[in-house]
Amino acid sequence: MAKKSKIAKNEQRKVVVERYAAKRAELKKALVDPNGTDESREAARLGLQKLPRDASPIRVRNRDAVDGRPRGNLSKFGISRVRFRDMAHRGELPGITKSSW
């Protein structure tokens, strides 16, 4: 079980990323625009730097939806490998069977 403060901080980051997503996308588009001038690119770069650090989506950590475990996350299911194994053994994941050959 992850610390509740770490889980809360990650949720707060998700909110910040969502809040600045449109502005960030606009600045990134201006940064790589082939028709843009050097001044507009410089302005876009400075604008991007002025955004909060947590506005970058790379700062959001994928965590287990049940207990918040940060490592070994299976993104298709949204849970960690440990939780996945337990749930699969108990038959709580429909369509998941243990391999045997």
From Swiss-Prot:
Gene3D superfamilies reported in the protein's UniProt record: 1.10.287.1480
Record field: transmembrane: none
GO terms for cellular component: small ribosomal subunit
Keyword Transferase: no
Keywords: Ribonucleoprotein, Ribosomal protein, RNA-binding, rRNA-binding
GO molecular function annotations of the record: rRNA binding; structural constituent of ribosome
Listed InterPro entries: Ribosomal_uS14, Ribosomal_uS14_bac/plastid
GO biological process: translation
Assembly behavior: Part of the 30S ribosomal subunit. Contacts proteins S3 and S10.
Record family assignment: Belongs to the universal ribosomal protein uS14 family.
Free-text function comment from the UniProt entry: Binds 16S rRNA, required for the assembly of 30S particles and may also be responsible for determining the conformation of the 16S rRNA at the A site.
Listed name of the protein: Small ribosomal subunit protein uS14
